[in-house]
Swiss-Prot record:
This is Elongation factor Ts. Keywords: Cytoplasm, Elongation factor, Protein biosynthesis. One of its GO terms (molecular function) is translation elongation factor activity. Belongs to the EF-Ts family. The gene is tsf. InterPro entries: EF-Ts_dimer_sf, Transl_elong_EFTs/EF1B, Transl_elong_EFTs/EF1B_dimer, Transl_elong_Ts_CS, UBA-like_sf. Residues 76-79 are annotated as: Involved in Mg(2+) ion dislocation from EF-Tu. GO terms for cellular component: cytoplasm. It comes from Mycobacterium leprae (strain TN).
Length: 276
């Protein structure tokens, strides 16, 4: 008896872009293990794996204040442009900045004006007629560069980045370098600060995919270590902030430009509306 359902096949197809028969076949091969099925399709070359996993139907905005960042979701971009919706988001991020609360459940119980955050969201949702959701929050307490990006001029910011950093001796250069790093993260979607921050399970998965892809392409066994190393270096270049080529000078990495300004990035966070 199959350890998966038709819904699993459809979900795998939506996630990977692979054909229905391929999805069914790989679920049979993996005995219904969804994660292994996704990895198997990546090895076989299915398109857009992982990218669709990050997508969601949610609209909304990100808001920032004093080192704090939130994502507030709604159902349509029409509501995202609503002045009351944007006002509520700014009030909530003000609560995060003042009370240093990032746990969403705890934040819902915090006060905003004469009501809780949860009550304020529920009241506006009833008035507007759409489901509203406070999705996540973050705050950094050190020196922070903030960048907000709009997808369109008539929409509120949909991408928000916080970069916590140690400044160099030249304050102006440090501020500019940190802001550039924030813009870099917004544009190229770095996932990790350095190689040391990449979880071992992620590295293991990337190694396995690189090796299996090379084998499937008929590469000789003795060449596999070099091929895997090359693919891992490509992964680091794409996913690790300090190893990415700068969007301002692609002959230099982000690390080189930060070092030139005497800036040390300690951590960052990136929120994008509707994405993981």
């Amino acid at each position: 008896m199959a350890n998966f359902t038709v819904a699993d096949v459809k979900r795998l197809r939506a996630l990977t872009g692979a054909g229905m028969l391929d999805c069914k076949s790989v679920l049979v091969e993996t005995d219904g293990n969804f994660d292994k099925a996704v990895e198997s399709l990546r090895i076989k070359g299915a398109k857009d794996v992982g990218k669709r996993a990050e997508r969601a139907t949610a609209e909304g905005l990100v808001a920032a204040k004093d080192g704090a960042l939130i994502e507030l979701n709604c159902e349509t971009d029409f509501v995202a442009k609503n002045a009351e919706f944007q006002k509520l988001a700014n009030q909530i991020v003000g609560v995060v900045a003042a009370a240093k609360i990032v746990d969403v459940d705890a934040l819902k119980g915090a006060s905003v004006g004469d009501k809780t955050v949860e009550q304020a969201i529920a009241e506006l949702a009833a008035k507007i007629g759409e489901k509203l959701k406070l999705r996540r929050a973050a705050i950094f307490n050190g020196t922070v560069a903030t960048y907000l990006h709009k997808r369109a001029a008539d929409l509120p910011p949909a991408v928000g980045v916080l970069v916590e950093y140690g400044a160099g001796t030249d304050a102006a250069n440090s501020t500019a370098a940190a802001h550039a790093a924030a813009l870099q993260i917004a544009a190229l979607k770095a996932r990790f600060l350095s190689r040391d921050d990449v979880p071992e399970d992620v590295l293991a998965s990337e190694r396995r995919i690189a090796e299996e892809t090379a084998k499937a392409a008929g590469k000789p066994e003795q060449s596999l270590p070099k091929i895997v190393e090359g693919r891992l270096n490509g992964f680091f270049k794409d996913s690790v902030l300090l190893e990415q080529p700068s969007v301002f000078d692609n002959k230099k990495t982000v690390k080189v430009l930060l070092d030139e300004a005497g800036v040390t990035v300690t951590r960052f966070v990136r929120f994008e509306v509707g994405q993981a």
